[in-house]
């Protein structure tokens, strides 16, 4: 190998190193972007989990309150009073069933 061939080989090797370094820098930037995105998503996920637990607690309270309200209305109805919008608070004659009250009590 003469000096020119050696120099050309060294120059090619140097160019390959520069291309490799450029590719490594590109991959490094992509990894940095992915890490940042991952961090943002982890924070967002944590906030969503907190919000979900608050909503679940509110829903549980609402269901409990709804159940208590329904039981209260059922008690009033069983005591012989209307609970429907049409006759609310009026005594049911001879404790006859009222279709409006029944519908209100047993709707989903």
UniProtKB/Swiss-Prot annotation:
Q: Which GO terms describe its biological process?
A: DNA replication
Q: Does the keyword Cytoplasm apply?
A: yes
- Mind telling me which InterPro entries this protein's record contains? YabA (IPR010377)
Ligand binding (Zn(2+)) = 82, 84, 98, 101
The main location is cytoplasm
- Does Repressor appear among the keywords? no
Q: Which domain of life is it from?
A: Bacteria
- Subcellular localization: Cytoplasm, Nucleoid
Pfam families reported in the protein's UniProt record? YabA
A cellular component term, taken from the record's GO annotations: nucleoid
What does the record's cofactor remark say about binding? Binds 1 zinc ion per subunit.
Name the cofactor(s) required for activity, per the record: Zn(2+)
Assigned keywords, A-Z: Cytoplasm, DNA replication, DNA replication inhibitor, Metal-binding, Zinc
Note the subunit structure.
Answer: Homotetramer. Interacts with both DnaA and DnaN, acting as a bridge between these two proteins.
Family membership: Belongs to the YabA family.
Q: Give a short account of what the protein does.
A: Involved in control of chromosome replication initiation. Inhibits the cooperative binding of DnaA to the oriC region, thus negatively regulating initiation of chromosome replication. Inhibits the ability of DnaA-ATP to form a helix on DNA; does not disassemble preformed DnaA-DNA helices. Decreases the residence time of DnaA on the chromosome at its binding sites (oriC, replication forks and promoter-binding sites). Tethers DnaA to the replication machinery via the DNA polymerase beta sliding clamp subunit (dnaN).
Question: In its UniProt entry, what is this protein called?
Answer: Replication initiation control protein YabA
Q: Which organism is it from?
A: Streptococcus agalactiae serotype V (strain ATCC BAA-611 / 2603 V/R)
List the top taxonomic levels of the source.
Bacteria, Bacillati, Bacillota, Bacilli, Lactobacillales
